[in-house]
C-alpha cells in the first residue's frame, strides 16, 4: 500500500498522465500508436511506460472478459460482519478470503458491517452453495447480508487521471 501522504501521482507530468489514460483505454495499444497519441517519439514513450511500470503506477495488464459468456452471470455483493471475540479474527478472515477464487474483491469497510465482498457465480443455486459451504464457514463470520445485482448500470476499472 502507498502512503497517502506522499501522493506519488502528484509528480507525474502531463505526458505521463496522458500515457496512463491511453493505456487505461487500451492496454494492448502498440508503442508506436501510443507515442503518436501522447506526442512523443517511440523510444522515449517506451522508456516512460517502463518507468511507470517500475514505479508501480502500472501494476499489470489484463483482458476484460464477458462474465455472461463464461457462466458467471450473477453478480452478488455480500456484507460480512465478524464476531470480534477473537483478537486475531480480522487477520484470520483476511488470510482465508485470499484463498477463495470465487471472491473477486474484498474490502474492509467502516460502518455497520466489516467487509464487503464481490463475487460472480453462474446462478442463485451456485450462490447458495458458496454462501452455505464457504462464506459462512470463514473464520469469525457472525452475520452476512446479500445483495443480488439485477442490472449493471455502470462498470469500469478506469481511474480518473487529470491532465494538467
From Swiss-Prot:
Annotated keywords: Activator, DNA-binding, Transcription, Transcription regulation
Domain of life the protein comes from: Bacteria
GO cellular component: cytosol; protein-DNA complex
Keyword DNA-binding: yes
GO terms for biological process, alphabetical: alanine catabolic process; negative regulation of DNA-templated transcription; regulation of DNA-templated transcription; response to L-leucine
Keyword Transcription belongs to the record: yes
Outcome, altering residue 114 to E: In lrp-1 mutant
DNA-binding region: 31-50
Residue span, HTH asnC-type domain: 12-73
Molecular functions per Gene Ontology: DNA-binding transcription activator activity; DNA-binding transcription repressor activity; identical protein binding; sequence-specific DNA binding; transcription cis-regulatory region binding
Segment forming the signal sequence: none
NCBIfam families, per database record: PRK11169.1 (NF008370)
Function: Mediates a global response to leucine. Exogenous leucine affects the expression of a number of different operons; lrp mediates this effect for at least some of these operons. For example it is regulator of the branched-chain amino acid transport genes.
Binding partners and assembly: Homodimer.
Name assigned to this protein: Leucine-responsive regulatory protein
Organism: Escherichia coli (strain K12)
Lineage of producing organism: Bacteria, Pseudomonadati, Pseudomonadota, Gammaproteobacteria, Enterobacterales
Amino acid at each position: 500500500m502507498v502512503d497517502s501522504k506522499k501522493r506519488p501521482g502528484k509528480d507525474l507530468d502531463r505526458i505521463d498522465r496522458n500515457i496512463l489514460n491511453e493505456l487505461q483505454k487500451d492496454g494492448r495499444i502498440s508503442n508506436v500508436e501510443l507515442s503518436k497519441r501522447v506526442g512523443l517519439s517511440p523510444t522515449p514513450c517506451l522508456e516512460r511506460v517502463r518507468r511507470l511500470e517500475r514505479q508501480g503506477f502500472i501494476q499489470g495488464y489484463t483482458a476484460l472478459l464477458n462474465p455472461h459468456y463464461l457462466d458467471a452471470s450473477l453478480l452478488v455483493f455480500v456484507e460480512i460482519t465478524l464476531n470480534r471475540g477473537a483478537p486475531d479474527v480480522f487477520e484470520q478472515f483476511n488470510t482465508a478470503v485470499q484463498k477463495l477464487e470465487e471472491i473477486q474483491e474484498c474490502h474492509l469497510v467502516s460502518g455497520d458491517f466489516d467487509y464487503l465482498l464481490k463475487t460472480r457465480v453462474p446462478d442463485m443455486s451456485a450462490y447458495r452453495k458458496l454462501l452455505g459451504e464457504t462464506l459462512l464457514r470463514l473464520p469469525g463470520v457472525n452475520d452476512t447480508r446479500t445483495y443480488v445485482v439485477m442490472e449493471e448500470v455502470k462498470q469500469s476499472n478506469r481511474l480518473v487521471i487529470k491532465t494538467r
